Amino acid sequence: GRIGTVKVTAGRYNDAFAESNIYDNRVDGIKLGVNLGHASYLVGAYGKMASADVSSAPGSTGISAAGRYARAALGGEWGRFDGEINYVKAKDVMNMGKQGSDDKIWSVGTNYKLGKLKVGAMYLQGDNDVVDAYGGSDWGTVYSLRYGASDKKKTGSWGLFTQYFNQGAATVISHPMYGDTKSFPLEGYKGYVVGGNVTLAPNMV
């Protein structure tokens, strides 16, 4: 709901940080969003990650990817461009082999839209003691290209997409991509994905 000009989301809900490149899963928390005008916004959030994710630690099925977290984001749109800066601090991170350590991640990303075509790029920087001790990478980049998009209410709507990821373990907590991101947990992952979606019937994508 809203309290004056502030949009409030509270309880258990799904949230995505940095276009899902840092985290995309359930949280128990509160998120406040303020429209700053001129298509810009400010977001602040605090809570606990409630992902019930499968961490890379042996026998840890069902353990959440991380514990408490705080997040701040600033973004907006300028003509054909949109962009967002994120900062996330998470405690007790289990995913990506981080063994319950703390993780600090910031990102800056932008997209350019031309008709149905959308091109994006993002840079991420992480800080995690376990990854540092291992000698793993603490930075990452993501590039994306999209054409069109499916609309769950519009039968026959469709979209195509491709993304390239090069993310060190320190830059990600829980990623929703179709692929094995945990085979070499402290190394992070590198590769691309290609896909598409189409709405066959209302609410059937």
Regions found by a protein language model. Give the residues of each.
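Outer membrane beta-barrel
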Residues: 1-57, 66-86, 111, 137-176
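Outer-membrane beta-barrel pore domains
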Residues: 79-82, 87, 91-205
